[in-house]
Amino acid sequence: ASDVYKRQHIDGFRFDLAATLARQFQEVDKLSAFFDIVEQDPVISRVKLIAEPWDLGSGGYQVGGFPSSWSEWNGRYRDCVRDFWRSQPSTLPEFASRLMGSSDLYQVNGRRPVASVNFITAHDGFTMNDLVSYNEKHNEANGEGNRDGESNNRSWNCGVEGPTTIKDVNELRQQQMRNMFATLLLSQGIPMICGGDEVARTQQGNNNAYCQDNAISWTNWDLDEDQKDLLEFVSKLIHLRLEHPVLHRRCLLYTSPSPRD
Protein backbone atom coordinates (compact mmCIF):
# COMPACT_ATOMS: atom_id res chain seq x y z
CA ALA A 1 0.00 0.00 0.00
CA SER A 2 2.85 2.39 0.80
CA ASP A 3 4.38 1.72 -2.61
CA VAL A 4 1.09 2.40 -4.39
CA TYR A 5 0.73 5.67 -2.48
CA LYS A 6 4.27 6.82 -3.31
CA ARG A 7 4.51 5.72 -6.93
CA GLN A 8 0.95 6.20 -8.18
CA HIS A 9 0.02 9.20 -6.00
CA ILE A 10 -3.14 7.54 -4.68
CA ASP A 11 -4.24 9.52 -1.64
CA GLY A 12 -6.36 6.95 0.13
CA PHE A 13 -7.74 3.43 0.42
CA ARG A 14 -11.19 1.99 0.99
CA PHE A 15 -11.32 -1.35 2.84
CA ASP A 16 -14.11 -3.74 1.88
CA LEU A 17 -15.73 -5.60 4.80
CA ALA A 18 -13.24 -3.82 7.04
CA ALA A 19 -14.55 -5.28 10.30
CA THR A 20 -12.85 -8.52 9.22
CA LEU A 21 -9.48 -6.80 9.62
CA ALA A 22 -10.21 -6.20 13.30
CA ARG A 23 -11.11 -9.78 14.14
CA GLN A 24 -8.94 -11.61 16.67
CA PHE A 25 -10.00 -15.15 17.51
CA GLN A 26 -13.31 -14.54 15.69
CA GLU A 27 -14.19 -11.48 17.81
CA VAL A 28 -14.01 -7.88 16.58
CA ASP A 29 -11.24 -6.14 18.53
CA LYS A 30 -11.14 -2.37 18.09
CA LEU A 31 -7.57 -2.42 19.44
CA SER A 32 -6.39 -5.14 17.05
CA ALA A 33 -2.84 -5.40 15.78
CA PHE A 34 -3.98 -4.32 12.32
CA PHE A 35 -4.93 -0.85 13.53
CA ASP A 36 -1.65 -0.58 15.47
CA ILE A 37 0.32 -1.40 12.32
CA VAL A 38 -1.59 1.21 10.31
CA GLU A 39 -1.15 3.92 12.95
CA GLN A 40 2.60 3.26 13.21
CA ASP A 41 3.26 3.23 9.47
CA PRO A 42 4.83 6.61 8.55
CA VAL A 43 3.12 6.64 5.14
CA ILE A 44 -0.22 4.84 5.51
CA SER A 45 -1.08 6.68 8.74
CA ARG A 46 -1.18 9.94 6.74
CA VAL A 47 -3.48 8.87 3.88
CA LYS A 48 -7.26 8.74 3.72
CA LEU A 49 -8.53 5.48 5.24
CA ILE A 50 -12.14 4.56 4.54
CA ALA A 51 -13.84 1.51 6.03
CA GLU A 52 -16.87 -0.44 5.00
CA PRO A 53 -17.43 -0.98 8.74
CA TRP A 54 -19.14 -4.35 8.72
CA ASP A 55 -18.70 -7.97 7.69
CA LEU A 56 -20.82 -11.13 7.72
CA GLY A 57 -19.69 -12.47 11.10
CA SER A 58 -21.16 -12.12 14.57
CA GLY A 59 -20.74 -8.59 15.94
CA GLY A 60 -19.46 -7.42 12.59
CA TYR A 61 -21.59 -4.28 12.29
CA GLN A 62 -19.15 -1.64 13.56
CA VAL A 63 -20.48 1.68 12.25
CA GLY A 64 -19.01 4.34 14.54
CA GLY A 65 -16.49 1.94 16.02
CA PHE A 66 -13.33 2.55 13.99
CA PRO A 67 -10.32 4.59 15.16
CA SER A 68 -10.48 8.37 14.91
CA SER A 69 -8.13 8.50 11.91
CA TRP A 70 -10.60 6.53 9.80
CA SER A 71 -13.71 7.52 7.87
CA GLU A 72 -16.58 5.05 7.58
CA TRP A 73 -19.35 4.26 5.16
CA ASN A 74 -22.33 5.28 7.28
CA GLY A 75 -24.86 2.52 6.67
CA ARG A 76 -27.22 4.01 9.23
CA TYR A 77 -27.29 7.23 7.20
CA ARG A 78 -28.27 5.27 4.08
CA ASP A 79 -31.04 3.35 5.83
CA CYS A 80 -32.48 6.38 7.61
CA VAL A 81 -32.56 8.62 4.53
CA ARG A 82 -34.24 5.91 2.48
CA ASP A 83 -36.83 5.36 5.20
CA PHE A 84 -37.50 9.07 5.67
CA TRP A 85 -38.20 9.75 2.01
CA ARG A 86 -40.57 6.79 1.75
CA SER A 87 -42.47 8.19 4.75
CA GLN A 88 -41.69 5.50 7.29
CA PRO A 89 -43.03 6.50 10.74
CA SER A 90 -40.84 7.96 13.50
CA THR A 91 -37.83 8.66 11.29
CA LEU A 92 -37.62 12.46 11.72
CA PRO A 93 -35.45 12.57 14.89
CA GLU A 94 -32.87 10.21 13.45
CA PHE A 95 -33.03 11.97 10.07
CA ALA A 96 -32.10 15.24 11.80
CA SER A 97 -29.14 13.54 13.47
CA ARG A 98 -27.91 12.07 10.18
CA LEU A 99 -28.28 15.44 8.45
CA MET A 100 -26.16 17.07 11.16
CA GLY A 101 -23.27 14.60 10.99
CA SER A 102 -24.36 11.59 13.08
CA SER A 103 -22.89 12.82 16.33
CA ASP A 104 -24.58 9.91 18.11
CA LEU A 105 -22.14 7.63 16.28
CA TYR A 106 -18.97 9.72 16.24
CA GLN A 107 -18.90 12.18 19.15
CA VAL A 108 -17.81 9.66 21.80
CA ASN A 109 -14.16 9.59 20.76
CA GLY A 110 -13.98 13.15 19.48
CA ARG A 111 -14.27 12.43 15.78
CA ARG A 112 -15.11 15.08 13.20
CA PRO A 113 -17.87 15.15 10.54
CA VAL A 114 -15.46 13.66 7.98
CA ALA A 115 -15.69 10.40 9.93
CA SER A 116 -19.06 9.85 8.25
CA VAL A 117 -19.08 8.95 4.56
CA ASN A 118 -22.72 9.63 3.77
CA PHE A 119 -24.31 7.66 0.96
CA ILE A 120 -27.72 6.54 -0.24
CA THR A 121 -26.62 4.14 -2.97
CA ALA A 122 -23.38 2.33 -3.78
CA HIS A 123 -22.03 -0.20 -6.28
CA ASP A 124 -24.05 -2.90 -4.50
CA GLY A 125 -27.82 -2.55 -4.49
CA PHE A 126 -30.29 -0.36 -6.35
CA THR A 127 -29.25 2.71 -8.30
CA MET A 128 -30.93 5.96 -7.24
CA ASN A 129 -33.35 5.71 -10.16
CA ASP A 130 -34.25 2.13 -9.30
CA LEU A 131 -34.65 3.06 -5.64
CA VAL A 132 -37.65 5.21 -6.61
CA SER A 133 -38.91 2.88 -9.35
CA TYR A 134 -39.00 -0.61 -7.80
CA ASN A 135 -40.35 -2.10 -4.60
CA GLU A 136 -38.75 -5.46 -5.33
CA LYS A 137 -35.44 -6.60 -6.81
CA HIS A 138 -35.53 -8.02 -10.34
CA ASN A 139 -32.37 -10.11 -10.66
CA GLU A 140 -33.73 -12.81 -12.97
CA ALA A 141 -31.03 -12.06 -15.56
CA ASN A 142 -28.38 -13.22 -13.07
CA GLY A 143 -29.51 -16.82 -13.47
CA GLU A 144 -30.11 -17.53 -9.78
CA GLY A 145 -33.90 -17.47 -9.76
CA ASN A 146 -33.94 -13.95 -8.27
CA ARG A 147 -32.58 -15.38 -5.01
CA ASP A 148 -29.37 -13.32 -5.04
CA GLY A 149 -29.08 -9.71 -3.90
CA GLU A 150 -30.58 -7.86 -0.95
CA SER A 151 -34.35 -8.26 -0.53
CA ASN A 152 -34.84 -5.45 2.02
CA ASN A 153 -34.03 -2.39 -0.08
CA ARG A 154 -36.07 0.29 1.71
CA SER A 155 -37.26 1.42 -1.71
CA TRP A 156 -40.57 2.86 -2.97
CA ASN A 157 -41.72 2.69 -6.57
CA CYS A 158 -44.03 5.73 -6.31
CA GLY A 159 -47.05 3.63 -7.19
CA VAL A 160 -45.99 1.56 -10.21
CA GLU A 161 -43.36 -1.18 -10.43
CA GLY A 162 -40.74 -0.34 -13.05
CA PRO A 163 -40.96 1.89 -16.14
CA THR A 164 -44.24 3.67 -16.78
CA THR A 165 -45.76 6.32 -19.02
CA ILE A 166 -47.88 7.74 -16.19
CA LYS A 167 -46.86 11.40 -15.97
CA ASP A 168 -47.60 11.91 -12.26
CA VAL A 169 -45.57 8.84 -11.27
CA ASN A 170 -42.56 9.90 -13.34
CA GLU A 171 -42.69 13.43 -11.94
CA LEU A 172 -42.82 12.08 -8.39
CA ARG A 173 -39.81 9.86 -9.09
CA GLN A 174 -37.86 12.85 -10.37
CA GLN A 175 -38.78 14.78 -7.22
CA GLN A 176 -37.80 11.90 -4.96
CA MET A 177 -34.36 11.67 -6.56
CA ARG A 178 -33.91 15.41 -6.04
CA ASN A 179 -35.02 15.07 -2.42
CA MET A 180 -32.36 12.46 -1.75
CA PHE A 181 -29.60 14.27 -3.61
CA ALA A 182 -30.40 17.47 -1.70
CA THR A 183 -30.29 15.57 1.58
CA LEU A 184 -26.96 13.97 0.70
CA LEU A 185 -25.22 17.14 -0.45
CA LEU A 186 -26.54 19.34 2.36
CA SER A 187 -25.59 16.91 5.16
CA GLN A 188 -22.55 17.28 7.38
CA GLY A 189 -19.95 14.65 6.51
CA ILE A 190 -18.47 13.38 3.25
CA PRO A 191 -21.04 12.88 0.47
CA MET A 192 -20.57 9.82 -1.74
CA ILE A 193 -22.45 9.62 -5.05
CA CYS A 194 -22.56 6.39 -7.01
CA GLY A 195 -21.46 7.14 -10.57
CA GLY A 196 -24.41 7.30 -12.93
CA ASP A 197 -26.96 8.28 -10.30
CA GLU A 198 -26.55 11.91 -11.31
CA VAL A 199 -28.02 10.98 -14.72
CA ALA A 200 -30.68 8.60 -13.33
CA ARG A 201 -28.95 5.43 -14.50
CA THR A 202 -31.09 2.31 -14.21
CA GLN A 203 -30.20 -1.36 -13.85
CA GLN A 204 -33.80 -2.32 -14.62
CA GLY A 205 -34.39 -3.30 -11.01
CA ASN A 206 -31.30 -5.51 -10.75
CA ASN A 207 -29.61 -4.84 -7.41
CA ASN A 208 -26.74 -7.30 -7.84
CA ALA A 209 -25.48 -6.57 -11.34
CA TYR A 210 -21.82 -7.53 -10.79
CA CYS A 211 -22.17 -10.27 -13.44
CA GLN A 212 -23.88 -8.12 -16.07
CA ASP A 213 -21.39 -6.71 -18.58
CA ASN A 214 -24.14 -5.38 -20.81
CA ALA A 215 -26.79 -2.66 -21.01
CA ILE A 216 -28.06 -3.59 -17.53
CA SER A 217 -24.91 -2.26 -15.86
CA TRP A 218 -23.63 0.19 -18.46
CA THR A 219 -24.25 3.95 -18.35
CA ASN A 220 -26.06 5.30 -21.39
CA TRP A 221 -24.75 8.81 -22.00
CA ASP A 222 -27.43 9.61 -24.58
CA LEU A 223 -29.39 11.65 -22.05
CA ASP A 224 -33.02 12.68 -22.30
CA GLU A 225 -34.28 16.01 -20.98
CA ASP A 226 -35.15 14.65 -17.53
CA GLN A 227 -31.65 13.22 -17.16
CA LYS A 228 -30.05 16.48 -18.25
CA ASP A 229 -32.18 18.40 -15.76
CA LEU A 230 -31.20 16.05 -12.93
CA LEU A 231 -27.51 16.38 -13.83
CA GLU A 232 -27.81 20.17 -13.74
CA PHE A 233 -29.60 20.00 -10.38
CA VAL A 234 -26.88 17.82 -8.84
CA SER A 235 -24.14 20.04 -10.27
CA LYS A 236 -25.71 23.12 -8.70
CA LEU A 237 -25.99 21.36 -5.35
CA ILE A 238 -22.30 20.47 -5.48
CA HIS A 239 -21.38 24.09 -6.21
CA LEU A 240 -23.63 25.26 -3.38
CA ARG A 241 -21.90 22.90 -0.98
CA LEU A 242 -18.45 24.06 -2.04
CA GLU A 243 -19.36 27.73 -1.73
CA HIS A 244 -20.76 27.57 1.81
CA PRO A 245 -18.43 26.41 4.62
CA VAL A 246 -21.41 25.91 6.94
CA LEU A 247 -22.23 22.79 4.87
CA HIS A 248 -18.88 21.19 5.67
CA ARG A 249 -18.14 22.11 9.27
CA ARG A 250 -15.00 20.96 11.05
CA CYS A 251 -16.85 20.04 14.25
CA LEU A 252 -19.92 17.95 14.90
CA LEU A 253 -23.28 19.39 15.83
CA TYR A 254 -24.38 17.38 18.84
CA THR A 255 -27.74 15.64 18.72
CA SER A 256 -29.34 12.61 20.31
CA PRO A 257 -31.95 10.98 18.07
CA SER A 258 -35.03 9.68 19.87
CA PRO A 259 -35.72 5.95 19.70
CA ARG A 260 -38.14 4.88 17.03
CA ASP A 261 -41.65 3.97 18.06
Provide a role label for each language-model segment.
Residues 30-195, 210, 245-248, 252:
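Conserved alpha/beta catalytic core and glycan-binding cleft of carbohydrate-active enzymes
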Residues 228-249:
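Catalytic cores of secreted or luminal carbohydrate-active enzymes
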Residues 19, 55, 199:
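Active-site-proximal loop/turn and secondary-structure-junction residues that shape catalytic pockets
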Residues 194-199, 203:
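Short acidic/histidine-rich active-site segments
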Residues 6-21:
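Active-site groove signature of glycoside hydrolases
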